Structure formats: structure tokens, C-alpha cells
């Protein structure tokens, strides 16, 4: 059965970057835009999976989601 890994892009308001949370051990990504984040996942995640989860066979997939929390302007 094909494996799907979850990768969340969490927006850090202070640092102004998306940071990763993932079920892929060792995957650490930061990027200034969501598009850059996705490109880094596509580039780096297959290598990290191969290195840290050698029993996982291709093909595998990445479910990439973006999360951003906004404060109300009326606080």
C-alpha cells in the first residue's frame, strides 16, 4: 500500500516564515512563502524519507497543508 506523509506549514508571525511539522522524522523546513515551502518539501522530503525510513517503499506521497492563525484587528 502506498504511504502518504503529512507535512504542515505553520506560519510564525514573529519570524515571518512557514515552519514544518511532519510525521517524517528529521524533516525540518522553513520558508518565507508557501510556494517556497512546497518546493523544499518536494526537493528534500524524499531524501529524508529514504535516509530515516528505509523500509518505506516508493511511491509515497506528501499531504502538504498550510496553517495560519490571524488575530482580530479589534483587540
Regions flagged by a language model, labelled:
Residues 1-8, 28, 35-75:
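Short, charged, surface-exposed hinge/linker loops at domain edges
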Residues 14, 30-31:
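A generic "functional-site adjacency" signal
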Residues 23, 32-34:
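Surface loops and adjacent helix of pleckstrin homology
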Residues 6, 10-24:
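Short aromatic-glycine-(Arg/Gly/Cys) micro-motifs in beta-strand/loop hairpins
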